[in-house]
Amino acid sequence: MTDERIHILRDILLELHNGASPESVQERFDATFTGVSAIEISLMEHELMNSDSGVTFEDVMELCDVHANLFKNAVKGVEVEDTEHPGHPVRVFKDENLALRAALIRVRRLLDTYESMEDEEMLAEMRKGLVRQMGLLGQFDIHYQRKEELFFPIMERYGHDSPPKVMWGVDDQIRELYQKALGTVRSLPEASISIVKADFEAFATEFESMIFKEESILLMILLESFTQDDWIQIAEESDAYGYAIIRPSEKWVPERKSFVEKKSVEEASQSETVDGQVQQVIDTPEGQFTITFTPKEKEAVMDRNSQQAFGNGYLSVEQANLILNHLPMEITFVNKDDIFQYYNDNTPADEMIFKRTPSQVGRNVELCHPPKYLEKVKAIMQGLREGKKDKYEMWFKSESRGKFVHVTYAAVHDETGEFQGVLEYVQDIQPYREIDTDYYREIE
């Protein structure tokens, strides 16, 4: 991969940005490239968004469809072992896309049939069927959440931070188009079928385009970058988010290879001297040599069960962890450098109000949220950091879960008053809202 090639790719997108027609750019692209890797696309977007070229995140989002179409017939495939095995995250991801496309086709056919149907009784049944199929199709949001919360953090660790931002922004646009389409479907027969079909096709066009981007660009980046350990982590954390329409037919358990070499009979021997130094005999082609050195002291490993001063008493690390995990709320700590550093484990991952997984730990808090919420996240962090407020409180009702959720973002300061980070705690207060007496002290 050469810098020149990346610059040409960048120039092509800048031409589009400045009004060039896709046809004229296509000709130059075909004349220049015999194939383009997903890594190059990633680097190109990163360069565009972080240069002084004038291209912004929003511009790249607008160009996303255009450049994806340009690359459609020129993306090099990547072969990686095990990806077609049932339960592998890549296989699961592709199987979900197949199931989602099938649901989309069913909705499209129902709409076409509805348009030509005249029997009122049949039309009523078809309306019910449309709502059911749209609900099934709506599970794409689970597919997107797993992508955003499990794939994107690992991509960022490998330096691919621009593609997640762009794709997450487009995901949110698709979600909005779906909600609009669902609303018009539910408004039948009051809404005209032509409006319903137009809203659905607006969603379907972007949705099918995203499937291409996922499988022809996103997965190529992942397959070029991710290790087997990365895929194992994703597979282990996927249950917390669930699956769209279908579940993996089996658990993926890859064959692990050990990279620890067996000790050789001729391996160098060591012996400790009186003064604590170590002598080591090394075999080389020129003969044996003896070297003497002072070994590095091993760091003491903290005992998680040893008691130590803790606030107004004594606790072990293990006890402190148990207490945090038994608090009736979800806790997240973001340190003063805006890094997501900790969350407690008080409920199964699939039952969390705000889902958290180990792969999110260590990320910048801004990358943990959809682009549309970025300004609000920045405002909260800045307000708490600068002392404008000690805390921010929010609440909302979740009808689907039967919960009334209360969220608090509180500034954390040390004894000197220095800002150390933000503590978020989330709890379901619906049980407290249902208390209708002034007194209860029974133990039944």
PLM features per residue range, with description:
Residues 1-141, 145-392, 396, 403-405, ...:
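Small-residue-biased structural context
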